[in-house]
């Protein structure tokens, strides 16, 4: 049975569980508990960045002084409020 050599990279990025079998032989199980957490964190940050870009875009659009946009402006504001509430809930 071959055993994998641990490099500094695998030691730093993988969590190593060492279990003892009934016959006294030790086995190593490599897992990535932090990779899932990191991906989740990355996605959360990226969604916030996307949200910020949308807010900046809508604020720029809404700041335009065009009388034909009066009714659109209120409609968009209502939709934006609903959308942002749903985003923060989920």
UniProtKB/Swiss-Prot annotation:
Q: Which InterPro entries match?
A: Flu_proapoptotic_PB1-F2
Which chain positions carry the site (Low pathogenicity)?
Answer: 66
General function of this protein? Plays an important role in promoting lung pathology in both primary viral infection and secondary bacterial infection. Promotes alteration of mitochondrial morphology, dissipation of mitochondrial membrane potential, and cell death. Alternatively, inhibits the production of interferon in the infected cell at the level of host mitochondrial antiviral signaling MAVS. Its level of expression differs greatly depending on which cell type is infected, in a manner that is independent of the levels of expression of other viral proteins. Monocytic cells are more affected than epithelial cells.
Taken from the record, one Pfam family name reads PB1-F2
Q: Where is this region: Disordered?
A: 1-31
Cell compartments where the protein resides: Host mitochondrion inner membrane; Host nucleus; Host cytoplasm, Host cytosol
Q: The organism's lineage?
A: Viruses, Riboviria, Orthornavirae, Negarnaviricota, Polyploviricotina
The record's keywords, sorted A to Z, are:
Apoptosis, Host cytoplasm, Host membrane, Host mitochondrion, Host mitochondrion inner membrane, Host nucleus, Host-virus interaction, Inhibition of host innate immune response by virus, Inhibition of host MAVS by virus, Inhibition of host RLR pathway by virus, Membrane, Modulation of host cell apoptosis by virus, Viral immunoevasion
Which range is the signal sequence, renumbered to this chain?
none
Cellular component terms, GO, for this chain's entry?
Answer: host cell cytosol; host cell mitochondrial inner membrane; host cell nucleus; membrane
The entry's family comment says: Belongs to the influenza viruses PB1-F2 family.
What else does the entry mention about this protein?
A: Is not encoded in all strains, and seems to be dispensable for replication.
Polar residues: bias regions? 1-27
The ranges of region (Mitochondrial targeting sequence) come to 65-87
Give the record's GO biological process terms.
symbiont-mediated perturbation of host apoptosis; symbiont-mediated suppression of host cytoplasmic pattern recognition receptor signaling pathway via inhibition of MAVS activity
On assembly, the entry states: Oligomer. Interacts with human SLC25A6/ANT3 and VDAC1. Interacts with host MAVS.
- The protein here is known as Protein PB1-F2
> Gene behind this chain?
PB1
Q: What is its main location?
A: host cell
Q: Which HAMAP family match?
A: INFV_PB1F2 (MF_04064)
């Amino acid at each position: 049975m071959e055993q994998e050599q641990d490099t500094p990279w695998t030691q730093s990025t993988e969590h190593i569980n060492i279990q003892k079998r009934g016959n006294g032989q030790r086995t190593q199980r490599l897992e990535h508990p932090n990779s899932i957490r990191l991906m989740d964190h990355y996605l959360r940050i990226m969604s916030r960045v996307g949200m910020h870009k949308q807010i900046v875009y809508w604020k720029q659009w809404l700041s335009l002084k065009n009388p034909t946009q009066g009714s659109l402006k209120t409609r968009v504001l209502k939709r934006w409020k609903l959308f942002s509430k749903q985003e923060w809930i989920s």
